[in-house]
């Protein structure tokens, strides 16, 4: 199972994720309590091996902002969490994750407008996009409704429920941020436990 640890701001947290087998490291460039600058992400990325993908999280960025981060960090993947047009997701300089909030158990009608992107399902937004620590209603989503083989599940995951999420959705990857935090800070033990649990699902 591919595991993405998101919202990292400190070298010690990046090390905890990488050392315990994370496959993707997420840096948040959108307005958030986990926001980092391109310069900060560049410094943190120096300690990330080439086999671990670096992901930048954005909400309605300009094309200039995307290009600056892709080159400056550098990023392997951009994660779009706003109302970005499909053309912004069709790019050759980075892979793309397009995030969709699942509201009232319904999938967005435009989910198929992004054929080349990973599709990330998340809980509805609160003050900021993503990172709310809440799950969407899993019971109302039928895995058969999702034709993507690049499905990523996010929203309220933790070491206690990630196995159920994986068995239910059979996703390409799982994505976590607040679920590996204690008092708003990344917790190395929670990171270790989550990755071990997620990768233990057969």
From Swiss-Prot:
Organism domain of life: Bacteria
Family classification: Belongs to the TrpF family.
Biological-process GO terms, alphabetical: L-tryptophan biosynthetic process
Record's keyword terms, sorted: Amino-acid biosynthesis, Aromatic amino acid biosynthesis, Isomerase, Tryptophan biosynthesis
Protein name stated in the entry: N-(5'-phosphoribosyl)anthranilate isomerase
Pathway(s) the chain acts in: Amino-acid biosynthesis; L-tryptophan biosynthesis; L-tryptophan from chorismate: step 3/5
GO molecular function: phosphoribosylanthranilate isomerase activity
InterPro entries cross-referenced by the UniProt entry: Aldolase_TIM (IPR013785), PRAI_dom (IPR001240), RibuloseP-bd_barrel (IPR011060), TrpF_fam (IPR044643)
